[in-house]
């Protein structure tokens, strides 16, 4: 017997893994997006999974967001996060040139090894520091938009985004764009001989 009530459409599941150096701001970004608050105390993350629903381009999407530890001692544990991933968000902090350098020297090689063919989104964090007083930050060391965009092109990311979790600027936009990319992506990271290329088309920054 058929029901006279229409069944609710099931959300589309997409998995996004968030990578980047320790203290880059990944967990703060996720807290603001999923819980609506900015943590005042830094607590290093070993591993955490967030589930958050989002509506993009007429589609209801269930995002599984995997927060990972950036410290070297967790490299093996982090490798377990990559299975069946649709998009990887690689993050760096605009006040840490090491974190941007590691996008290319550490994170890209790790992704290529564990999750070949996955779509990449590069995200600049702590962008509020660009407007901070000289007493708070050395502006000669701050990474500007053009440098971030150049890095995104170098790793063949399909999006380059900038945000401030502290001010809640660009946070929703970052995950909306990542979800949009994930919608059209195939899951990677199953060691199935996937295509090694990380992205096609031009960056939308």
Swiss-Prot record:
Positions annotated to bind GTP: 20-27, 67-71, 125-128
As one GO molecular function, the record gives: GTP binding
Q: Which residues carry this modification: Cysteine methyl ester?
A: 202
Q: Which InterPro entries does the UniProt record give?
A: P-loop_NTPase, Small_GTP-bd, Small_GTPase, Small_GTPase_Rho
| Known partners and oligomeric status | Interacts with for3.
Q: Which family does it belong to?
A: Belongs to the small GTPase superfamily. Rho family.
- Its protein name is GTP-binding protein rho3
